Every structure is written in structure tokens, then in C-alpha cells.
Amino acid sequence: MPDIAVWNKCDNRCVMCTNMTSFALQDSGQYRLKAQIEKMERYLKGLGRIYLKNPDKAGYVNLTGGEPTLHPDFFPLLAYFRRRLPGLPITLLSNGRRFADRKFAARFAAAARPPFGAAIALHGPNAKTHDPVAGVRGAFGQTVKGLQNLFELAPGLAIEIRIILHKKTIAALPATLKFLLEKFPDTSRYSVTLIHYEIEGMSETNHRSVGLKFAASSKVLAKALPLIRRFADLRLYHFPLCQVSPELRPLCRVTLPREDRVYPPVCSRCAVKRKCLGLMLEYFKKFGAAELKAIRK
């Protein structure tokens, strides 16, 4: 199932957002309830290429944005997707801020019938780090409160906390992990995903301020290994296996489609190529492949 852009507006202005500002300026009519239902019904009938991202992936669906929770018909839309996709895992990608409203969070908990998940982005251990990345003062407090409400009100919800790693967040990663362990000590209740940022949309526009090479991020990951080991379920996205320590390689996942990845010549000599992401195509264009080293068994 595809990634579905539920709504094109957002209440954050994240410096590394993969959308361009032009996305938010589109006519929102194409994202309203009636239009969303029509698109899904056409998709289910196999009537052409309806969704652009991951249209051929089976087994799950991601509800993305913008910020999906801002959709004026958010709850009717959730009910529709759950009814038309029974038994299919659905994941809501959100900044979590609207869940700071306890009534809203409770209503979501009732509507998000399993299998259902929420992937909430956290940009740091405090407002000083998180808010400048989110582009909104007060965002950190609302996101953390939103997470608290989801933990309390939605026991059947699969909660994932996503930390996007770039120049503005990488140094704070150990502190962010410590914050999570202290604030939400039952790590069996949620998963954590550390994602090396993708170079597209606003992250490309803001390349000077967010650009991060694997050589830098891998050093911080290695230092954070004792903290990483304390989480029941922690994963790494978008990392070539040769760029992380051997202890971290089992945590790496390949989540990008083949057309968004490349295997430079050095990869042909690598013993773990088949299990590896390679390089993100846009990363390769921006930074090249000099960092890569073939792993020998």
C-alpha cells in the first residue's frame, strides 16, 4: 500500500522537511474527505497510478502530510481508512502536537483500532533543541504532552518515536535518548527510529544548516551505543552498513525504494551488499561515495 498525503498544511516549519513550501500552497480541495475517498476507491479498483510514493508496496499504509491531524475531517477519514483497509497496519506520521489536547487524543485512541500506529517526530531533549528545528516556539512541550497522552489513553497503539539526524540534532542525540529513557522508561511500550535525514524539499534548501555526512553521525552513534542498547526496539534508517559499528549493523533497515538508492563501485566488493541500503541517491549527488568501505567477512 502507498504513502497517502492526507493533508498539505502543517503547524510546524521543520528545517529538514522533505516537502517544499509549494506543497502547502496547493489547493487543499484535492485532500478533502470526498477527494481522499475517491482516490482510495480508484486505487482499490486498480484504476491507474493514484499515489506517487510507494504505490507498489504491500502490507501497510502510511498516512502523511503536511500534518494529518489538521485535516478538517480527520476522524471521519480515519474511520473510512480503517473500514476499507481492515486488518492492514496503518501508521500515522505526525508531529504529535494536537495530541496534547487530551480530548483529541482520546478520540484518536478510540478511532485508531489495531493494527494502528503513530510515528511521532522528536527533535531533541528540550525546547532549546527541538523548537528551532520544528520552527515553532512551544512545539516541544506540545509534542511531549501528546506522547504522554497517547501512552495513557491508547494502550493498543503502536507508538514509534522518530529522531531525524542532521547537523542541528546530531550532537544532542545522546541527551535525547537519555530524555526518552527517563521520561518513558518502559521501552517495551514504544520503538525508536533514528533516521539519517533525506536530501529533498526544505532539507535541500537548508543544506548549509542541516547537511550531515555519515562520518560525523556514525561517531555520535558509536558513543551513544550504551544508551541505544537500553531500548527494547531501536532501528536505524538510511545508513550504509559500513558507516556504523558492527554492533549497530543488525539495527539497520532498508526502507527506501531501489530507484532512490545507488551502489557505487566500491560496493561490488562488499560482502554484505545484499543486506545494505547502499547510498541514498541525493546523498551520493551531494557528498559522493568516498566514505564507503567494502566490508570483508
Kindly give the residue locations of the regions a language model identified.
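N-terminal [4Fe-4S]-dependent radical SAM core
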Residues: M1-D3, R49-K57, E247-V254
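Canonical Radical SAM [4Fe-4S] cluster-binding loop centered on the CxxxCxxC motif
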Residues: M1-R42
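A cross-taxonomic marker for long C-terminal extensions/tails that follow the last structured domain
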Residues: C17, F231, L236-P240, L279-F287
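Radical SAM/AdoMet-radical enzyme domain recognition
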Residues: E41-N62, H71-A171, L181-V192
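Flexible mid-to-C-terminal extensions adjoining Fe-S/redox cofactors in radical SAM and related proteins
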Residues: M20, A24, S245-K297
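Radical SAM enzyme [4Fe-4S]-AdoMet core and its adjacent flexible, acidic
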Residues: Q26-Q30, A121, K128-Q148, E152-T255, ...
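Processing junctions and N-termini across compartments
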Residues: I4, N8-D11, L236, R261-P264
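Active-site beta-strand/loop signature of hydrolases that rely on acidic residues for catalysis
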Residues: G65-G66
